[in-house]
Amino acid sequence: MAYISENELKFLRLLERTKRLTKEDMSANVWKVSAATKILNKMIYTLQNDETTNDILHEYRQEVLQLKLLAEAESKSSAEERLKVIEKIPRVFPDVQVTVADSKNDNEAESYDFEKESAAGLRATQRSIYRSDLRKQLLSSNKHRAQDTSEDQEFMKNELVEEELANSLATMARSFKTMMSAAGDVIKEDTERAILMAKEVDDNKTALGIQSERVERHAYKCGYDCFKVMLIVLIFMSFVSMVLMMKIFKKAST
């Protein structure tokens, strides 16, 4: 469950209250919805400074845009003009998730559960109402009215199916984005580890080269020292031999 700021919580509460107003009685609450959208836009401007809302600000803006267009459509005089405004509402965008937890401490969290109003439901309901009004202006028979009601219900059903599909696609896209981001982090971490290991190999190779040079110099020095010792021993033995020979020849001559 995500933790949100106090400003975002206030925004979500007002957003859901406004959506309920449009569902209850749009014609009677149009001025309230219009005023609420202005406040919501100001609150979105404040939320731009909150880094935790960057990923969902676009969805917030689309939700507020829909409410603004619903209020604008209701203020039009004819059903045809209302339908034109309704068609401006984005057909595909996910509902804002408003089941959240607000916590100032890590140990305490207060949960806030909202009664969610579907964006597709609001849009489909108002469009159905305006379509019905337009048909009533053109067709007055009971037969046509019954047929229009059936068509409106089918239209709302199709709208909800499309919205559910759009939400599923949006969820899959977010999941794919998260997976790609995680894979990128893993690849980056592995690359850094490989670079570090390559550096360690180079350092070890350099250290081994230095150590080999030291061993080579030490071996050369040891060989040179051994040669000097052997030369000294040879000279000493030659000297001793000469002394012995001199003594032997001296005794022989006497």
From Swiss-Prot:
Function of the protein: SNARE that may be involved in targeting and fusion of Golgi-derived retrograde transport vesicles with the ER.
Entry's Gene Ontology cellular component terms: endoplasmic reticulum; endoplasmic reticulum membrane; SNARE complex
Membrane topology field: Single-pass type IV membrane protein
Keyword Transport: yes
The keyword Transport is annotated on this UniProt entry: yes
Species lineage: Eukaryota, Metazoa, Ecdysozoa, Nematoda, Chromadorea
Entry's localization field: Endoplasmic reticulum membrane
GO BP field: protein transport; retrograde vesicle-mediated transport, Golgi to endoplasmic reticulum
GO MF term list: SNAP receptor activity
Lumenal side: 250-254
Family according to the record: Belongs to the USE1 family.
Transmembrane segments: 229-249
Protein name in UniProt: Vesicle transport protein USE1
Pfam families: Use1 (PF09753)
Major place of residence: endoplasmic reticulum
